[in-house]
């Protein structure tokens, strides 16, 4: 079975083809970073228009890479949500239309389930059950995962997501878009211990997150200190350290609460090297394992959507002719795969 996956939930256009026997056959990705850079963030209308231009050519490129035609495809998986409504409508309309034209099933996929299952594309995938930390620009979720679709949300951000806090703090420091990776790069030159940032919501029980106060603390620290390069690097280091420590503390709590020893981290922020090192050290101490996708599959991509769609189609899940786009869609509303 071969599934073509389409991802257009935000500012990346991703298309991939996944074979249930041979694995990933093709992977095409176009990033809109340059398009949005002048605005300091994603402009939804521009994102939607660019998806319109790029999706069909990327589908053809993926077919060419795999040496296939439309007749070799058994289903179309597309991101139905959550995400920017206009961007979602582009991918879902194209996906649903192509499925109708090619006479194959269409499978709407939850964007965060795609991220959660992205480590399954690796040579050493995690076994169920596990705890998943989903960290991106729009979401920070702690999820107990007993199987595909069998999800219980243990904690989530009550305000800014971790990736959003990275981007906003980077903007406060005058760093160009996309700010998160640039802040992490600046932090590499930082000195540990010069600044001490709080670890929000770690002084109380629970697994929810809050990063808006950390952003405010960063703003006050920036205003109170010199603007030389070393000071900027030290502030960036302290901020990144605080986010990583907070996530690690919450992960350890979640693992203790569930009695699990396997941790999956996915989403755009999971590409952060410092965060990976923190979680690896924490899991080593407790005798557990941590899994995450390769860097190119941490950010939005079509491969994770094709894989998730494959699992849903095998479970007999398809849709009628209606185009599905759900800007808000809690992951624990998904049906478990039997």
UniProtKB/Swiss-Prot annotation:
Reaction(s) the record says it catalyses:
L-threonylcarbamoyladenylate + adenosine(37) in tRNA = N(6)-L-threonylcarbamoyladenosine(37) in tRNA + AMP + H(+)
Sorted UniProt keywords: Acyltransferase, Cytoplasm, Iron, Metal-binding, Transferase, tRNA processing
**A single Gene Ontology molecular function, please?**
N(6)-L-threonylcarbamoyladenine synthase activity
Work out whether the entry's keyword set contains Cytoplasm. Answer: yes
Essential cofactor(s): Fe(2+)
Q: Which SUPFAM superfamilies match?
A: Actin-like ATPase domain (SSF53067)
GO CC annotation terms, alphabetical? cytoplasm
Segments traversing the membrane: none
- Keyword set includes Metal-binding: yes
- The record's top EC class is transferase
Which GO terms fall under biological process for this protein? tRNA threonylcarbamoyladenosine modification
- EC no. given is 2.3.1.234
Kindly list the places in or outside the cell where this protein is found, as annotated in its UniProt entry: Cytoplasm
User: Which annotated residues bind Fe cation?
Assistant: 111, 115, 300
**Top-level taxon:** Bacteria
Quote the function comment for this protein.
Answer: Required for the formation of a threonylcarbamoyl group on adenosine at position 37 (t(6)A37) in tRNAs that read codons beginning with adenine. Is involved in the transfer of the threonylcarbamoyl moiety of threonylcarbamoyl-AMP (TC-AMP) to the N6 group of A37, together with TsaE and TsaB. TsaD likely plays a direct catalytic role in this reaction.
The family this protein is said to belong to: Belongs to the KAE1 / TsaD family.
Tell me the PANTHER family matching this sequence.
TRNA N6-ADENOSINE THREONYLCARBAMOYLTRANSFERASE (PTHR11735), TRNA N6-ADENOSINE THREONYLCARBAMOYLTRANSFERASE, MITOCHONDRIAL (PTHR11735:SF6)
Name this protein carries in UniProt: tRNA N6-adenosine threonylcarbamoyltransferase
Q: What gene makes this protein?
A: tsaD
